[in-house]
């Protein structure tokens, strides 16, 4: 594949994801990362992966769209006064929770490449500010491969089931390293592969938007982090997320399972992965 063809392919992937998530933001689709092709309550999924009912009750209506595969906010152990960057911030689900933890002296910046998601998050900001009295969360339109954030200005980078959607994950990690302050922390939940998926699954558009087809091997994630310059890398597989999707008979996961070799299941291939690292 030539350089021009590679560039065209990356743009095609971005556009597929952008269109899929615009439909989700507009309420025209529920098939997305986090397995919410299913009609299950997003709150049920969120609680299954570590969010408390109390935290969920504080969120603006529509901020939780069932797009998560872990709880990076809890893993990050945020402190008052920190500056936090949320990659692929969607409707503000993690950004608003982070905002309450860093308080008035802190700041949260959400970045998303989908205009419809940015509009939704900014609308939700009014509710957040009225409830908390805080004006410390903002949302910026941009691609996570080219973050609209200066060098060395962020204490913690969060992301929840988003980096796998990028057609250039190595560039994402380089950008994360660039914007972090020395000693800054990565706290990410994402989907990763235990072994390579069959081509029939990787070529499914629904599986791409659903965060499956774009996932890479756990070992590849470690390699990209190391190449970007990170240290203290900890990768923790959490299989319960995929098992929950299977048990809830999620339509996307059922469709993918039907394309797998006989006798194999989703949990043999896919896992929720917690990524922690330092600059």
Give the label of every model feature segment:
Residues 192-212:
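Short, glycine-/aromatic-enriched active-site segment of Class I SAM-dependent methyltransferases
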Residues 213-229:
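Short alpha-helix
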Residues 71, 79-146:
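Class I SAM-dependent methyltransferase SAM/SAH-binding core
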Residues 4, 226-279:
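C-terminal lobe and adjacent flexible extensions of AdoMet/dcAdoMet transferase-like proteins
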Residues 170-185:
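A short glycine-rich, Lys/Arg-flanked "PGG" loop and its adjoining helix->strand segment in the class I
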Residues 2-46:
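N-terminal auxiliary segments of SAM/dcSAM-dependent transferases
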Residues 37-83, 87, 94-101:
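Conserved alpha-helix/loop element of class I SAM-dependent methyltransferases that forms part
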Residues 84, 157-158:
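Hydrophobic beta-strand segment of the Class I
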